[in-house]
Amino acid sequence: MSRPLVITEGMMIGVLLMLAPINALLLGFVQSTPDNNKTVREFNVYWNVPTFMCHKYGLRFEEVSEKYGILQNWMDKFRGEEIAILYDPGMFPALLKDPNGNVVARNGGVPQLGNLTKHLQVFRDHLINQIPDKSFPGVGVIDFESWRPIFRQNWASLQPYKKLSVEVVRREHPFWDDQRVEQEAKRRFEKYGQLFMEETLKAAKRMRPAANWGYYAYPYCYNLTPNQPSAQCEATTMQENDKMSWLFESEDVLLPSVYLRWNLTSGERVGLVGGRVKEALRIARQMTTSRKKVLPYYWYKYQDRRDTDLSRADLEATLRKITDLGADGFIIWGSSDDINTKAKCLQFREYLNNELGPAVKRIALNNNANDRLTVDVSVDQV
């Protein structure tokens, strides 16, 4: 007759210690490892594509979550419990074009002339209407792109914001020299630009406190553009990002845009993604209030060739770069123009099932647990 097994307190503690890492992994907890440069992170991919537009053709896109493990709003709603994006919410000051091509100033045109109270009132209305759930727990994205709060960065199509800002100061001080006028225009623009962006974010966090809030595209990098041809972010841009800690400390999530361009080489496309993710991770590491998630915005089409889906090679190389650098996941974005006909919906579903979905599952979500979740946050290499 066998003797009964006696489980001692020491044995029980040993078993619990062995099970603890497994339980933490299954429950999605974040754990530090003995190496201070490594941490265990959850990795999530979000669906921010308006595929609800295809429902009228009998195409439901259930496989997004069921087959590929991508976080998708219930019933494929565009705004739901996982993610909600607010396009140009509120009444930010902006210079817009009317149907005739004439420039019209909305709410003052530039932040230093804008009515913040009016903007916040409209923003609250938009938020209540578009995210009615007060306990919304997902990723909340504020997509405002009319101007940037760093005066220098309003170039190209955004140059009118600098021009108007300078004109206002020159009218007030006709005897000032050009340098003094521009310095004052810069000071005012950045002061009130910060105020509008800060107060908007505060309002969003007050009204939907369970959400993870961030501004689309920030931090910027501008790498692999005509004026910044390197894959690395330019030092000036990085210094300006450091000065924007007022924004990044308040955000819960950093959302750099890593849209690819056809006119780059395959290696440059990987470099573009690497440089922008690396900069977001650098900023995230500097923050003192809380750990900031980094979720790059990823489009499955080439930004400068919108009728062309990303190739399998570009999908695999760039998704692998995002995971290898240690981001917390990424957000798959799509335009309504991508799927505004039945033919486009059918073509996109084929692409999803043949290329995009399998690549996401294979590279981002189906990696070995240690390779996927234990990531090196020392991002010295792009």
Swiss-Prot record:
Glycans are attached at N115, N263. The keyword Disulfide bond applies. Homotetramer. Residues 29-33 form a propeptide. Its EC number is 3.2.1.35. One of its GO terms (molecular function) is hyalurononglucosaminidase activity. The active site is at E145 (proton donor). Expressed in the venom glands of worker bees. It is also detected in the testes of drones but not in the queen-bee venom glands or in pupae. Keywords: Allergen, Disulfide bond, Glycoprotein, Glycosidase, Hydrolase, Secreted, Signal, Zymogen. It is an enzyme of class 3 (hydrolase). One of its GO terms (cellular component) is extracellular region. It catalyses: Random hydrolysis of (1->4)-linkages between N-acetyl-beta-D-glucosamine and D-glucuronate residues in hyaluronate. Disulfide bonds join C54-C345, C221-C233. It is found in: Secreted. The keyword Zinc does not apply. Residues 1-28 form the signal peptide. InterPro entries: Aldolase_TIM, Glycoside_hydrolase_SF, Hyaluronidase, Venom_Hyaluronidase. Pfam families: Glyco_hydro_56 (PF01630). Belongs to the glycosyl hydrolase 56 family. This is Hyaluronidase. Its main location: secreted. Hydrolyzes high molecular weight hyaluronic acid to produce small oligosaccharides. SUPFAM superfamilies: (Trans)glycosidases.
